[in-house]
Amino acid sequence: MILLLGASGYVGQVFSSELRRRRRSFIPLTRQAIDYTSFDVLFNYVRKIKPEFIINAAGYAPKPNVDACELAREEVLCANALLPQTIARVCLLTNTPWGHVSSGSIYVGAKVAAEWGRMRIERDLNQPEMRRLFAEHPEKIYGFTEWDEPNFSFRHAPCNFYSGTKALAEEAIRGVGQSYIWRPRMPFNERDETRNLLSKLQHYARVYDNVNSISHLDEFVRACLELWERQAPFGIYNVVNPGAVTTRRIVEMIQRILKPDRRFEFWKNDEEFYRYQAKTPRSHCILDASKLLSLGVRMRPVEEALEDALERWQTASPSAKFAGAGVR
């Protein structure tokens, strides 16, 4: 039996659906049912039910974007950094394997092939040289691997508070007990929801263009479960669709497939975006998914996954989509 924490959240709901599809016995927990942020409460509960695996899909859900985290720092810290440590301690003491949904937003930029086989890190993927390289020679740009230290964190400022807490959690739980750390990036699928990247882009008044790795949410969840079911080595995994994509390219696909009745406008440059829109730094990065693929866990190339999601797009009613930020 599997214990699923954060079952009512954006990611947790997809874990619930996939576990049901696989006919897996599981208990979907929310904080309304049990205060699993309390060590004593969670420890006693785990000892009582003895799950074979625990999934932590709980965390602070920033809405409409990560700027919201700056106004709720205590809550964000508790949900994104302290809760994973509590779960890690409980799992260590009860000898329970578990998986933690982290984030790829603890990096910024990418690695670029330089002279003599060396690599250099470029934090700004929007500079003209990098955009030209991505368009003409993408093979010279490499994503961050699981062995690269996060460079968008409290230890490597500047960063936003959300990313800082996610990196802090990884640092605290890495190597503690039998644990997986799963890193998604900018999740999307065919369902119209506020945290879906494709929904966000369709509702932004102006779009900020950059280069990113992204994750088809359903494929992310399946990949996470496959790692556990295949008894893959515990550790960190970048769970993203292979490749990278510009925001402008995604918008082009939206226009071609969905044909929305609107024009898309873009911020002219980073300076304009940060002057008039963003309150905190943003993470834009490319992640390397080779470790995942080497274990036979497959995710579709990024543009194939995007095309499929848009071809099967399901528009939701406003009441079904919009809810406040908070812990799930």
Predicted regions: what they are:
Residues F39-A81, L92:
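NAD(P)H-binding glycine-rich loop region in Rossmannoid oxidoreductase-like domains
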Residues V14, A223-E226, R230-K279, S283, ...:
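Mid/C-terminal beta-alpha module of Rossmann-like enzyme folds, strongest
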Residues M1-R21:
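N-terminal Rossmann NAD(P)H-binding glycine-rich loop of SDR-like oxidoreductase domains
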Residues L5, L29, I54-A58, W98-G104, ...:
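SDR active-site strand-loop-helix element
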Residues C159, E170-R222, E226:
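NAD(P)-dependent short-chain dehydrogenase/reductase
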Residues R20, R24-N44, G59:
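Adenosine-cofactor binding site in Rossmann-like domains, unifying the SAM/SAH pocket
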Residues T280-R328:
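C-terminal amphipathic/interface module of NAD(P)-dependent oxidoreductases
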Residues L71-C78, L82-L83, S105-W182, N189:
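Catalytic helix-loop patch of NAD(P)-dependent Rossmann-fold dehydrogenases
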